[in-house]
Protein backbone atom coordinates (compact mmCIF):
# COMPACT_ATOMS: atom_id res chain seq x y z
CA UNK A 1 0.00 0.00 0.00
CA UNK A 2 2.18 3.14 -0.25
CA UNK A 3 2.90 5.67 2.35
CA UNK A 4 0.34 8.39 2.80
CA UNK A 5 1.28 11.85 1.60
CA UNK A 6 3.01 13.90 4.27
CA UNK A 7 0.82 16.64 5.74
CA UNK A 8 2.41 20.09 5.50
CA UNK A 9 1.36 23.49 6.77
CA UNK A 10 -0.19 25.67 4.09
CA UNK A 11 1.06 28.85 5.71
CA UNK A 12 4.23 30.46 7.03
CA UNK A 13 4.18 32.26 10.35
CA UNK A 14 5.80 35.70 10.62
CA UNK A 15 9.53 35.63 11.31
CA UNK A 16 9.14 37.92 14.34
CA UNK A 17 5.99 37.73 16.50
CA UNK A 18 5.81 41.28 17.92
CA UNK A 19 6.27 43.79 15.10
CA UNK A 20 3.70 46.48 15.84
CA UNK A 21 3.15 47.63 12.23
CA UNK A 22 2.43 44.07 11.08
CA UNK A 23 0.12 43.42 14.04
CA UNK A 24 -1.82 46.63 13.32
CA UNK A 25 -2.11 45.78 9.61
CA UNK A 26 -3.26 42.23 10.45
CA UNK A 27 -5.83 43.51 12.93
CA UNK A 28 -7.37 45.80 10.29
CA UNK A 29 -7.53 42.97 7.73
CA UNK A 30 -8.96 40.52 10.29
CA UNK A 31 -11.78 42.95 11.06
CA UNK A 32 -12.45 44.01 7.45
CA UNK A 33 -12.64 40.45 6.09
CA UNK A 34 -14.02 38.81 9.28
CA UNK A 35 -11.31 36.18 9.44
CA UNK A 36 -11.53 33.61 12.22
CA UNK A 37 -7.85 33.67 13.15
CA UNK A 38 -4.44 34.82 11.93
CA UNK A 39 -3.84 31.42 10.33
CA UNK A 40 -6.43 32.23 7.65
CA UNK A 41 -4.65 35.50 6.88
CA UNK A 42 -1.22 33.87 6.85
CA UNK A 43 -2.45 31.16 4.47
CA UNK A 44 -3.46 33.76 1.88
CA UNK A 45 -0.27 35.77 2.45
CA UNK A 46 1.75 32.60 1.84
CA UNK A 47 -0.22 31.91 -1.34
CA UNK A 48 0.55 35.42 -2.56
CA UNK A 49 4.25 35.03 -1.64
CA UNK A 50 4.36 31.84 -3.70
CA UNK A 51 2.79 33.55 -6.75
CA UNK A 52 5.29 36.41 -6.43
CA UNK A 53 8.23 34.03 -5.92
CA UNK A 54 7.30 32.13 -9.08
CA UNK A 55 6.93 35.40 -11.03
CA UNK A 56 10.38 36.66 -9.92
CA UNK A 57 11.96 33.35 -10.88
CA UNK A 58 10.23 33.37 -14.27
CA UNK A 59 11.23 36.99 -14.98
CA UNK A 60 14.88 35.94 -14.75
CA UNK A 61 14.46 32.62 -16.59
CA UNK A 62 14.97 32.16 -20.32
CA UNK A 63 13.90 29.40 -22.64
CA UNK A 64 10.89 27.56 -23.94
CA UNK A 65 9.94 26.01 -20.59
CA UNK A 66 10.02 29.43 -18.89
CA UNK A 67 7.59 30.78 -21.51
CA UNK A 68 5.22 27.88 -20.88
CA UNK A 69 5.36 28.42 -17.11
CA UNK A 70 4.82 32.19 -17.51
CA UNK A 71 1.68 31.56 -19.54
CA UNK A 72 0.44 28.99 -17.00
CA UNK A 73 0.97 31.35 -14.04
CA UNK A 74 -0.78 34.26 -15.76
CA UNK A 75 -3.63 31.98 -16.88
CA UNK A 76 -4.08 30.66 -13.32
CA UNK A 77 -4.20 34.17 -11.84
CA UNK A 78 -6.60 35.28 -14.58
CA UNK A 79 -8.94 32.34 -13.84
CA UNK A 80 -8.87 33.29 -10.14
CA UNK A 81 -9.83 36.84 -11.08
CA UNK A 82 -6.66 38.31 -9.59
CA UNK A 83 -5.32 39.64 -12.92
CA UNK A 84 -6.89 40.74 -16.23
CA UNK A 85 -6.38 38.65 -19.37
CA UNK A 86 -3.77 41.04 -20.82
CA UNK A 87 -1.59 41.07 -17.68
CA UNK A 88 2.19 40.66 -17.64
CA UNK A 89 4.47 39.15 -15.00
CA UNK A 90 5.19 42.56 -13.47
CA UNK A 91 1.49 42.78 -12.55
CA UNK A 92 1.91 39.67 -10.39
CA UNK A 93 4.49 41.52 -8.30
CA UNK A 94 2.03 44.36 -7.64
CA UNK A 95 -0.67 42.07 -6.18
CA UNK A 96 -1.57 42.60 -2.52
CA UNK A 97 -3.08 40.32 0.11
CA UNK A 98 -6.31 42.36 -0.14
CA UNK A 99 -6.62 41.27 -3.79
CA UNK A 100 -6.50 37.63 -2.68
CA UNK A 101 -8.87 38.18 0.26
CA UNK A 102 -11.38 39.83 -2.11
CA UNK A 103 -11.61 36.52 -4.03
CA UNK A 104 -12.69 34.51 -0.97
CA UNK A 105 -16.20 33.05 -1.10
CA UNK A 106 -17.06 34.83 2.16
CA UNK A 107 -16.21 38.26 0.70
CA UNK A 108 -18.00 37.65 -2.59
CA UNK A 109 -21.19 36.42 -0.86
CA UNK A 110 -21.22 39.65 1.16
CA UNK A 111 -20.50 41.88 -1.86
CA UNK A 112 -23.21 40.18 -3.94
CA UNK A 113 -25.72 41.07 -1.22
CA UNK A 114 -26.60 37.52 -0.19
CA UNK A 115 -25.76 38.42 3.43
CA UNK A 116 -26.18 41.57 5.52
CA UNK A 117 -22.70 41.47 7.02
CA UNK A 118 -19.47 39.73 6.19
CA UNK A 119 -19.81 37.72 9.41
CA UNK A 120 -23.27 36.56 8.36
CA UNK A 121 -21.79 35.57 5.00
CA UNK A 122 -19.34 33.32 6.84
CA UNK A 123 -22.15 31.76 8.88
CA UNK A 124 -24.30 31.12 5.79
CA UNK A 125 -21.38 29.37 4.08
CA UNK A 126 -20.42 27.21 7.07
CA UNK A 127 -24.06 26.19 7.63
CA UNK A 128 -24.40 25.08 4.01
CA UNK A 129 -26.78 27.77 2.74
CA UNK A 130 -24.56 28.85 -0.17
CA UNK A 131 -23.76 26.90 -3.31
CA UNK A 132 -21.26 27.57 -6.07
CA UNK A 133 -21.92 26.08 -9.49
CA UNK A 134 -24.64 23.83 -8.02
CA UNK A 135 -22.38 22.47 -5.25
CA UNK A 136 -22.60 23.43 -1.58
CA UNK A 137 -19.27 24.87 -0.43
CA UNK A 138 -18.74 25.04 3.33
CA UNK A 139 -15.33 26.72 3.31
CA UNK A 140 -15.38 30.53 3.64
CA UNK A 141 -11.77 30.64 2.43
CA UNK A 142 -12.57 29.01 -0.92
CA UNK A 143 -11.06 31.12 -3.71
CA UNK A 144 -13.80 31.68 -6.27
CA UNK A 145 -12.88 31.39 -9.94
CA UNK A 146 -13.98 34.18 -12.26
CA UNK A 147 -16.38 31.92 -14.18
CA UNK A 148 -17.93 30.64 -10.92
CA UNK A 149 -18.73 34.10 -9.60
CA UNK A 150 -22.10 34.33 -11.38
CA UNK A 151 -23.19 30.90 -10.11
CA UNK A 152 -23.08 31.80 -6.40
CA UNK A 153 -26.61 31.48 -4.99
CA UNK A 154 -28.52 30.18 -2.01
CA UNK A 155 -28.61 26.38 -1.89
CA UNK A 156 -31.79 24.73 -3.19
CA UNK A 157 -32.18 22.87 0.12
CA UNK A 158 -31.68 26.02 2.19
CA UNK A 159 -34.62 27.89 3.74
CA UNK A 160 -33.00 31.04 2.31
CA UNK A 161 -33.86 29.82 -1.20
CA UNK A 162 -37.48 30.91 -0.58
CA UNK A 163 -38.15 34.57 -1.37
CA UNK A 164 -40.50 34.75 1.65
CA UNK A 165 -37.80 33.87 4.22
CA UNK A 166 -37.85 36.63 6.91
CA UNK A 167 -34.08 37.12 6.95
CA UNK A 168 -33.98 37.32 3.17
CA UNK A 169 -36.65 40.04 3.26
CA UNK A 170 -34.46 42.03 5.67
CA UNK A 171 -31.49 41.64 3.30
CA UNK A 172 -33.59 42.78 0.32
CA UNK A 173 -34.84 45.83 2.26
CA UNK A 174 -31.26 46.72 3.18
CA UNK A 175 -30.27 46.49 -0.51
CA UNK A 176 -33.14 48.79 -1.52
CA UNK A 177 -32.20 51.24 1.24
CA UNK A 178 -28.64 51.45 -0.07
CA UNK A 179 -29.84 51.94 -3.65
CA UNK A 180 -32.02 54.94 -2.73
Curated annotation (Swiss-Prot):
Residues 103-165 form the S4 RNA-binding domain. Pfam families: S4. Gene3D superfamilies: RNA-binding S4 domain (3.10.290.10). Keywords: Ribonucleoprotein, Ribosomal protein, RNA-binding, rRNA-binding. GO terms for cellular component: small ribosomal subunit. SMART domains: Ribosomal_S4, S4. GO terms for molecular function: rRNA binding; structural constituent of ribosome. InterPro entries: Ribosomal_uS4, Ribosomal_uS4_arc, Ribosomal_uS4_CS, Ribosomal_uS4_euk/arc, Ribosomal_uS4_N, S4_RNA-bd, S4_RNA-bd_sf. GO terms for biological process: ribosomal small subunit biogenesis; translation. The keyword Lipid biosynthesis does not apply. This is Small ribosomal subunit protein uS4.
Amino acid sequence: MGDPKRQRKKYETPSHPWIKERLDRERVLMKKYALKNKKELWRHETQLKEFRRRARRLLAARGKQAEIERAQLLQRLNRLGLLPADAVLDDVLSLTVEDVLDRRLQTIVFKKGLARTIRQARQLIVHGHIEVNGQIIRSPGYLVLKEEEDTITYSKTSPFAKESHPERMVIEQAKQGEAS
